[in-house]
Amino acid sequence: MKYTLTRANPDANQYPLQERQVVNDPLQEEVNKNVFMTRLEDVLHNVVNWGRKNSVWPFNFGTSCCYVEYATTLTGVHDLSRFGAEVIRASPRQADLMIVAGTCFVKMAPVIQRLYEQMLEPKWVISMGACANSGGMYDIYSVVQGVDKIIPVDVYVPGCPPRPEALIQALMLLQDQIQLERRPLSAVIGDDLQPVYKPKMMPERDRKNAERIAVKNLRSMDEIK
């Protein structure tokens, strides 16, 4: 399986502050050396990742109208607590997940980047809505054309605005990614600077492409609920 290796770049003075490269499974080489110890490490990674993915604490942060849909997921109708993400934190130092919901203006970009840097590892980012993904309909000087220009993004949620169910699906996709990640199990001091291995996830558009092409008879508007 292919992974994306992310390492901090101490020489970078502007974003991106990390270096990325596509590598093979980091445990495969160790399996050939010592099956027992590598298997034990694999079990520890799975247990730790299970705890991480089921206790993702979002940072209470919104920049535009998509935040209304984000707040709707916290109601009893959608019950975000099913995924362990109902603990909304007011401080980035206590949060694991930043959901950028809405337009990222140029004046807001330094604030978003500073808040992201204040979050402790491990941390993840969900870009919610067309404006956060690519600037949306605001192709103007005052809007950043995608929040991934200033911080790394793990999951993109399309829509203007996306429905709460779309954000819940994004959270489920993020949980799948977290389960397959490979991070240091403790603090790492040295040249590696805590490398992070993230799996290369297939976009939902590509995953469902064959299924959608196979559809010949579309449902009428009366049948869609």
Swiss-Prot record:
Entry keyword Iron: yes
Family annotation (NCBIfam families): nuoB_fam, PRK06411.1
GO cellular component: plasma membrane; respiratory chain complex I
Protein name in UniProt: NADH-quinone oxidoreductase subunit B
Binding site for [4Fe-4S] cluster: 65-66, 131, 160
UniProt superkingdom: Bacteria
Family per record: Belongs to the complex I 20 kDa subunit family.
Enzymatic reactions: a quinone + NADH + 5 H(+)(in) = a quinol + NAD(+) + 4 H(+)(out)
Taxonomic source organism: Acinetobacter baylyi (strain ATCC 33305 / BD413 / ADP1)
Matches recorded under InterPro entries: NADH_UbQ_OxRdtase-like_20kDa (IPR006137), NADH_UQ_OxRdtase_20Kd_su (IPR006138)
Gene from which the chain derives: nuoB
Localization in the cell: Cell inner membrane
GO biological process, one term: electron transport coupled proton transport
PANTHER family: NADH DEHYDROGENASE, NADH DEHYDROGENASE [UBIQUINONE] IRON-SULFUR PROTEIN 7, MITOCHONDRIAL
E.C. code: 7.1.1.-
Pfam families, alphabetized: Oxidored_q6
Membrane topology per record: Peripheral membrane protein
Co-factor note (free text): Binds 1 [4Fe-4S] cluster.
Keywords: 4Fe-4S, Cell inner membrane, Cell membrane, Iron, Iron-sulfur, Membrane, Metal-binding, NAD, Quinone, Translocase, Transport, Ubiquinone
